[in-house]
Amino acid sequence: MPETESAFFPGGTAVSRLQVYDWAADDGLCGGSPHVHLACTEAYVVVGGSGALQTLTAQGLAEIPLRTGTVAWFGPGTIHRAINGDGALRVVVVMQNAGLPEAGDAVLTFPSDVLADPGAYAAAASLLDPGGSHASDENAAHRRRDLAISGFHRLAERIGAGDVSALTEFYRQALALRADRLDAWERLWRDGPSAAVARTGDHLAALRDGRVDHLLRAAAEVRHAPEPADRKFGMCGRLDTYELTPPSVKPAL
């Protein structure tokens, strides 16, 4: 009998279930911490409730309405903030490049002086895991959310006044915080998402040659939702995360 072959999760992506925070900020809006991904596209599939996604790019501040059934996605460099409009916003998050977000691909929009100091950033981020992005507890998640919103508003004001250099400065500070991880990120991408794409090329070549051996190695995999006590304090809200990365593709930061 042929040995089975572990299947990559579709597209080398990762999924999680998100309950957006319902804590009110100083501006009266409830929701999560504004942040940016440096290398990954993110998608929201709204499965309950309603709200909005605020985005900040070189084009300025924008707001995307979210309601059940909405699918929204945004590329690297899009600063984003999830707003819980009715207190019940729930989303399935699809992340490009499984492994990279878990390895710290996201950077919060803290004020510039905090971003300029790696130690200050790490302390303000209150990380559960130094290599990741989840907060250590609810109070820490609340504090860092408020600090990130203060930096977000400053960026939005400058960009709204036509000073796009504010965005460049933020990106450069974010890159400086993560520059020492780039080699590890590239390994994760090469061994995971890139390998998943390459495997499709191998399968197409086999089919073109009339070979079906790879189909005989097919297997199914499943992951179940974590226990409620194991839900993470993410940047946007409480997260149910799933370990979808093959064992051979793990961050070594």
Positions of PLM-derived features:
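Short, conserved beta-strand element in jelly-roll/cupin
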Residues: 38-53, 96
